[in-house]
Amino acid sequence: MANYQLAISNIAWHKEDDEAVYTAMQQAGFTGLEIAPTRIFPEMPYENLTSALLFGGYLKNQWGFSVPSMQSIWYGQTGNIFNPADAERLLDYTAEAFQFAHSLNCPSLVFGCPKNRMRALGDSDAAAEAFFMQAGNLAARYGVRLAIEANPPMYTNYLNGTAEAFSLVKRLDNPGLAVNLDLSTLLAQGEKLQNFVDDLKYVSHVHISEPGLAPIQKRPEHKELALLLGAVGYRGFVSVEMARTDLDTVKRTLDYVAEVFQ
């Protein structure tokens, strides 16, 4: 029996299908709902702390779900972590996200934000690393972790490989920082899961995803990942991440992932 649990991100279906998906999640043994905050609260999501608390209670009491992760945490935000003036404003916004996550008892926030981490010629890694150190300190204060996700060159030009994300988190050694292990990045970059066995202890959340967030395909890497996570005693969530699709595709995906990972 695996120590980890299963989740799916709510970016994968239309809002009107929420309850149908929640029912299918229960039937497939999923216990986590990963959320994009603006999917729940379209405007200024982090100002809705009371509503977040109520939403978390509804998920737990009505459906038995927790919120293991938040993604798209900077949706609609401009600015760049390599620019100190932008970084200060983005850090303030991230602190609001941490407080929101804390209200939901959500332990991990995915840092993808590819557009906000484009490195211009002459930009120093030190600026980005200073941002992450400050963000990690804030995350720890709220009892959450910022999970840094590698994104392929089709999205950004900083932290493209999974190895780079692990290297950064290990180097900064901040209790508020972790890695979001994203299978679509591994696939796009041609990386091998077995190369990261010793690094899995730095992972706070896992995405089962395809390049371009296409619907999940059946792959041998899924079983390999399930075995690796079981072997190292990973206790977080394995979460399906895909772009919005139809209800039947979501249901088929839930059943497939449950079959492979449970």
Residue ranges of model-derived segments:
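Active-site acidic/histidine proton-transfer and metal-coordination neighborhood
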Residues: 19-20, 61, 79-178
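Active-site-proximal loop/turn and secondary-structure-junction residues that shape catalytic pockets
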Residues: 12-14, 37-39, 73-76, 115-117, ...
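Histidine-acidic metal/acid-base catalytic patches
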Residues: 2-7, 15-31, 90-91, 105, ...
